[in-house]
Structures are given as C-alpha cells and as structure tokens.
Amino acid sequence: MTTIVSVRRNGKVVMGGDGQVSLGNTVMKGNAKKVRRLYNGQVIAGFAGATADAFTLFERFEAQLQKHSGHLVRAAVELAKEWRTDRSLSRLEAMLAVANKDASLIITGNGDVVEPEDGLIAMGSGGGYAQAAARALLNKTDLSAREITEAALNIAGDICVFTNHNLTIEEQDLAE
C-alpha cells in the first residue's frame, strides 16, 4: 500500500507520500508519485490503495472540482456520492486525501468525507505510525508543517514494509 500524510500549521498545508508500489509481497516500483496538484495547482491530492483505481478517482475528482468551480468540500461530497452509487466505481480500492487553503479531507469509497478536527491526515498501510509521529510533533515541537510531514513519513518508512523513503511533498500557503 502506501503512506500519505497531510499537516496544516502556521499558514501552510503540506501533503506528502512515499513512492513504493507493491504487488503482493514484491516491490514493483519505488518512485511512484502518489501526491499531485489538481485544479490549476489550487488543490493537493494524494492516494493510498490500488494505483489504477486511484488514477480513476483523481480524474473523477478533478471533474467534480471543475464542475463546482474548485469548491473542495462540494466536489468531495459529490465524488463520494458517485463513488458509493456507481457500480464500476464501487469496486475501486483506494482512498483520497485532498487539501486546499480552506480544508483538508479524506474521501473513502464508503461515501465518507471526513475533515479531521486537527488538520492532520495520515492514511494507508503506514498511516497509524505516521499519525502518531505527526501528532506528537504537532503537540510537542515548533517544527514546520513540511518538517512534520517529512518526519512522519520517514518514521512510517522505518516501520512499515509497504512504505519507503522516496518522498513526494507538495506545499501550499493558506493565503493563496
């Protein structure tokens, strides 16, 4: 699987992910880009789960962003509805993390759209490790959002066999 982390702090939102793609117990690729920008660079999105499924969801989510003029929450809710009710989409095995200047959200195939109350997202096979690390760093240090994201991903990469240290990090100022 993978690990995706997003942190909001001090006027910035940062999202990062590792680059490992596994097929069963075999590493197939180590430099996949699981975090990318959508909607003219205004939205950061990352995925955990099946790669082909995630690309389908990225396309559908970007279409919803276009349809709803970049309104993140509305686009996420509409994608979740579509994902839950469309037969072909309902079999997809992936989760999306999306963020912009206004919100950070997790979108699941069960139709859930969750905005974490502390602005911290950690998901995927190493998500629990990354969340614990990021939460401790948020509560006990003055590190930047980027530093916390990188540290949490590296800790997850040290522990989770489905997460590596080849990171993709995207950062956005909340004022943009």
Swiss-Prot record:
InterPro entries: ATP-dep_Prtase_HsIV_su, Ntn_hydrolases_N, Proteasome_sua/b, Proteasome_suB-type
Taxonomic lineage of the native organism: Bacteria, Pseudomonadati, Pseudomonadota, Gammaproteobacteria, Pseudomonadales
Gene behind this protein: hslV
UniProt subcellular location: Cytoplasm
Name by which UniProt lists this protein: ATP-dependent protease subunit HslV
Enzyme class name: hydrolase
Signal sequence region: none
Record-linked PANTHER family: ATP-DEPENDENT PROTEASE SUBUNIT HSLV (PTHR32194:SF0), METALLOPROTEASE TLDD (PTHR32194)
Native source species: Pseudomonas entomophila (strain L48)
Family indicated by similarity: Belongs to the peptidase T1B family. HslV subfamily.
Gene3D superfamilies reported for this sequence: Glutamine Phosphoribosylpyrophosphate, subunit 1, domain 1
